[in-house]
């Protein structure tokens, strides 16, 4: 819990943007017992760990982050690009679980 105290709760509430629900994220969750989140571009590993522990009341073993480049897209003669994203792969300690499919109470 000491990691939570080092960062302000207001900042930690903004670090996690959304869980990633995709075929690849589901495969990683089943095989490696990891959960994937979209996070703020300037979020650090300790902040991500503290935010997950605060919001979901679980213990985090490790955090890996990946910066994904936005895809180049074209509409007619105009070129554009999707936004860059940062994903966090959060490995939970054995016996811990986050279930996004169950109903909110």
UniProtKB/Swiss-Prot annotation:
One of its GO terms (cellular component) is ribonucleoprotein complex. GO terms for molecular function: rRNA binding; structural constituent of ribosome. Disulfide bonds: none annotated. PANTHER family: 60S RIBOSOMAL PROTEIN L23A. Part of the 50S ribosomal subunit. Contacts protein L29, and trigger factor when it is bound to the ribosome. One of the early assembly proteins it binds 23S rRNA. One of the proteins that surrounds the polypeptide exit tunnel on the outside of the ribosome. Forms the main docking site for trigger factor binding to the ribosome. This is Large ribosomal subunit protein uL23. It comes from Janthinobacterium sp. (strain Marseille) (Minibacterium massiliensis). The lineage of its organism: Bacteria, Pseudomonadati, Pseudomonadota, Betaproteobacteria, Burkholderiales. The gene is rplW.
């Amino acid at each position: 819990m000491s990691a939570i105290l080092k960062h302000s709760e207001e900042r930690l509430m903004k670090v996690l943007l959304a869980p990633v629900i995709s075929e690849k994220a589901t495969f990683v969750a089943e095989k490696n017992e990891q959960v994937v989140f979209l996070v703020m571009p300037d979020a650090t590993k300790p902040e991500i760990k503290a935010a997950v522990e605060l919001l979901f009341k679980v213990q985090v073993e490790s955090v890996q982050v990946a910066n994904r480049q936005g895809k180049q897209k074209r509409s007619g003669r105009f070129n554009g690009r999707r936004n860059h994203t940062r994903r966090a792969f959060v490995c939970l300690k054995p016996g811990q679980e986050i279930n996004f499919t169950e109903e909110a109470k």
